[in-house]
C-alpha cells in the first residue's frame, strides 16, 4: 500500500536552493523528513502562524538567506501560508506581490502552495480553531486569482488541495 514514506527522498535538481516557507504544515514536513531532508532545502516556518508572523519575522529570515546566496544560483521559494488566517486573503495578495518582486531580483522562482482540504466536522469535534471547507476554497481562489493567474502573475500555483480532493490522501 501507499501509506509508507518513500524509499528515497529526491534532492531537488532544477534549483540550487529551495526555500519552504509556512506554518505547522511546513514545520511538520521538516520534522517528518528529519535527517533525510535534502541539504539544498531550507525551512522557514512556525506553528500556528500566518501573515503577521511572515511580515514581522519570516520574510526577514527568508530575505537574508536568499540575499546571501550568489545571484546566479537558481532558487525556488514555496509559500505555504494561509490556513491560520483564511479571512486575510486580500492582505496576502497585496503583500506577496511585493515579496515576489523583491525576491525575483535574486533569481527566485515563486510558488504558492494551496491550503489543503480541512474536515470541519473533525475540527469541531476536537474543539479546534474553526475552519470550513468553504473558507479554504475561497482563500485558495483569491490566492490563485490575485497571485497566480494572468500575464502579470507573481507566483506559480501548486494545487495540492484539488489533487487531494480528487485522488485522496494515501
Q: What are these language model-derived features?
A:
Residues 18, 77, 110-112, 157:
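Hydrophobic/aromatic residues located in beta-strands of well-ordered beta-sheets
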Residues 28-29, 86-93, 119-126, 165-170:
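Extracytoplasmic/secreted cell-surface and envelope-processing proteins
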Residues 83-84, 102-136, 164:
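Active-site segments of SGNH/GDSL-like serine hydrolases
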Residues 120-160:
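Substrate-gating cap/lid alpha-helix
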Residues 34, 71, 82, 97, ...:
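Sec-exported extracytoplasmic/periplasmic mature domains
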Residues 12-95:
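Conserved SGNH/GDSL esterase-like catalytic core that processes O-acyl groups on lipids
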Residues 91-99, 133-139:
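Charged helix-capping and loop-helix junction motifs
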Residues 1-17:
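N-terminal low-complexity, Pro/Thr/Ser-rich intrinsically disordered segments
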Amino acid at each position: 500500500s501507499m501509506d509508507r514514506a518513500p524509499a528515497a527522498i529526491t534532492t531537488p535538481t532544477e534549483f540550487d536552493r529551495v526555500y519552504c516557507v509556512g506554518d505547522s504544515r511546513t514545520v511538520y514536513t521538516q520534522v517528518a523528513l528529519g535527517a533525510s531532508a535534502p541539504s539544498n532545502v531550507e525551512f522557514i516556518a512556525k506553528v500556528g502562524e500566518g501573515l503577521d508572523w511572515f511580515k514581522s519575522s519570516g520574510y526577514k529570515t527568508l530575505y537574508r538567506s536568499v540575499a546571501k546566496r550568489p545571484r546566479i544560483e537558481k532558487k525556488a521559494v514555496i509559500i505555504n501560508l494561509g490556513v491560520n488566517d483564511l479571512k486575510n486573503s486580500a492582505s496576502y495578495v497585496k503583500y506577496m506581490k511585493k515579496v515576489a518582486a523583491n525576491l525575483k531580483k535574486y533569481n527566485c522562482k515563486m510558488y504558492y502552495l494551496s491550503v489543503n482540504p480541512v474536515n470541519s466536522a473533525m475540527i469541531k469535534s476536537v474543539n479546534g480553531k474553526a475552519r470550513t471547507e468553504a473558507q479554504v476554497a475561497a482563500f485558495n481562489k483569491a490566492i490563485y486569482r490575485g497571485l497566480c493567474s494572468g500575464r502579470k502573475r507573481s507566483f506559480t500555483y501548486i494545487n495540492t488541495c484539488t489533487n487531494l480532493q480528487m485522488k485522496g490522501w494515501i
